[in-house]
Amino acid sequence: MVALTQIGAEFKIIATAHLKQIDRVLNGLTGSAHSLKEKSPHAITVGFAAVNYSEEWTGMEGTRSFPVKRTSARAQQESDETARRLRQVAGPAFDEFLLLTFRATNQEPFPFAWLNAAGIAADYGAALVRIADSYEKRF
């Protein structure tokens, strides 16, 4: 018996040091989509990427923490460039690609906010409808 994947998804979050990580994240996303298509050519591929627009972030690695601060202008510029590259490079590799933008610090009391909650909810809902439609047509 062979099991085939009908829907496969990959999710990446870029919280800090966006441009240092972008190539690794893009390779991970596109590689996942291509790998899934090789194994299950008719599979529906879904990509999610989340980009943090916050000026502050504390990264954690084991017991060590790494606080990062960027100016508001730098945070906006770096996040916008990251989002542009994700859409341009990773987006076409997937049947559906959803970019999520947020602000979070990873510092107590752990504030979190979507940049455009209503827009993200609408985009997510529309993607679900398109995925369901693709599923009905393919399977």
Where is each model-derived feature located?
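Short, charged, amphipathic alpha-helix that recurs within catalytic cores of restriction-modification
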Residues: 22-39, 85
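C-terminal tail/extension regions appended to the core domain(s) of diverse proteins
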Residues: 55-139
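Structural beta-sheet core signal
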Residues: 8, 46-49, 99
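Surface-exposed cleft-lining segments at the edges of enzyme active sites
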Residues: 12-24
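Generic beta-strand structural signal
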Residues: 5-7, 34, 41-45
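Nucleic-acid nuclease catalytic cores
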Residues: 38-60
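Conserved catalytic cores of phosphodiester-cleaving nucleases, focusing on short active-site segments
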Residues: 1, 5-15, 29
